[in-house]
Amino acid sequence: MALRCPIVSVLGHVDHGKTSLLDKIRRTRVTQREAGGITQHIGASEIPINTIKKVSKDLLGLFKADLSIPGILVIDTPGHEAFTSLRKRGGALADIAILVVDINEGFKPQTIEAINILKQCKTPFVVAANKVDRIPGWNSSEGPFILNFNEKNQHPNAMTEFEIRLYENVIKHLNELGFDADLFSRVKDTTKTINVVPVSAMTGEGIPDLLVIISGLAQKFLEQKLALNVEGYAKGTVLELKEEKGLGKTIDAIIYDGIAKTGDFLVVGNPDGVLVTKIKALLKPKELDEMRDPKDKFKPSKQISAATGVKISAPDLDNVIAGSPLRIVPKDQVDAAKEEVLQEVEEFTILTDDEGIIIKADTMGSLEALANELRKVKAKIKKAEVGDISKKEVIEASSYASTNPLNGLIISFNTKVLADAKVEIEKSDVKLLEGKIIYKLVEEYEDWIKEMEELLKSDEINRLTKPAMIKILPNCIFRQKEPAVCGVEVLYGTLKIGSPIMSEDGKKLGYVKEMRDNQQENIKEAKVGMQVPVSIDGNIVLSRNAKENDILYVEVPEPEARKLHHEFKDELRGDEKEALSRYMELKQKIENNIFWGM
């Protein structure tokens, strides 16, 4: 029975070394080209069986492994939790997975999340305990770990430290999550125990062991799943839409089942539903070359078989969305394939809110991941689309902001901002957040929301009437009325220009027209402890309805007093709280209503 390559997914926490580990196998340098050191798109690399046998020759006899699979196809799935959706897709597509864990740092939230995804997808996995070279005293060298793990090559203290870190940082956590696990060389029953393979992406130690374990497990337990479908049509997923010289727009895709031929029809999801177009060429990357950024040109193939990464050249691909499902079929099967693809596309619909922000991304998977992460921080999303940011979206966001300033935001993941949109943003009140790392965009969103909420709160507080108690100073009545001018001391709170003033018996006296400091300069407010001359315009007649040593209050309307008491109390100074408390007690007494302001 012919077997296809098992599809291998690599998951793990950010910076634990997923791409660097593959880098050691592929001999390329993908990691250094990725934004923020995080792999942002699902990539694919074929590792042929000859390469696996070559780097693992010392182990094949030791493990009595007879590998008959044609190789392995590695999907490099992003490791940060922001890419839950892409990882789910990667996990679901994968036959087996490598979970990368830093043996020195142990499990992180993203590690646990990755395990949960693998559980949901029922995908078997092996743990790569990376960075053994950083264990104090460890003598790490390229080649099999199992041949380096002995007292001849390692100091006893380093061996002890290795065992401690292996258990405390890896095995113990797996046990807590319900898995039996052990160092791969000690595993007796691979159906019940997780294999932990120590590796170093830096030196290459343990890479042969990892390849043998992955290949052997896939071949032993997934033989039926790996049986090549020699008659069925090809099924796959779009990774990226790319412009290629001499070819125009092309699709990079993973084919996970069936066979495709040049001249067949491509059925793929797009914004209008489904696109059907005739394939001009099927192009494959050279083995061990990374599809996202190949160093050499692709080679044409008349026929390809799963599992493989492929570049597809065909007409009318401009609007194809990355992450879309695809089928490659002969003409008589186009209608059936259209139904399948349409059904899958509909599953990608992102639910939107009646009000909220606009989010844009370069792929369906990224858009879904961005939306999911924003939902976790309680963001409301009015519009979510794949594609560049246009003037139309800026105008829409501006209209959203007119009803709620917190909605005047566009978040762009890995997309372009068109020229007319840039012009519109400059003259509008719309905020644009751009980035190539989703979790950082979410952090920026949270910072912006916090900043905006504080600004809006500050604006609202400033619009409210601030409470204050003042005392008319003796021998400081300078004018009796129209306006009355006298010296006052602020006992509690903040006295502002325009503040309405009332007496202790609740009579309206007027409002503060003017205040001056010791240098006779006009001021807008006076805080607790200040003694200032003020002019009060209104019904006040000094020495008649307001006298020396009288206590006067700033009159705060009940709705504003209630707001200050319930919503903004923490924003008030201690003396302002005291002024509000005394004022509310006075009003409750005057109005004969103990619930006044409550």
From Swiss-Prot:
KW DNA repair (keyword) present: no
Source organism of the structure: Methanococcus maripaludis (strain C7 / ATCC BAA-1331)
Protein name (record): Probable translation initiation factor IF-2
Gene3D superfamilies found in the cross-reference section: P-loop containing nucleotide triphosphate hydrolases (3.40.50.300), Translation factors (2.40.30.10), Translation initiation factor IF- 2, domain 3 (3.40.50.10050)
Protein family membership: Belongs to the TRAFAC class translation factor GTPase superfamily. Classic translation factor GTPase family. IF-2 subfamily.
Renumbered residue ranges of the record's region G5: 200-202
UniProt binding sites for GTP: 12-19, 76-80, 130-133
Region called G4, residue ranges: 130-133
HAMAP family per UniProt: IF_2_A (MF_00100_A)
Keywords linked to the UniProt accession: GTP-binding, Initiation factor, Nucleotide-binding, Protein biosynthesis
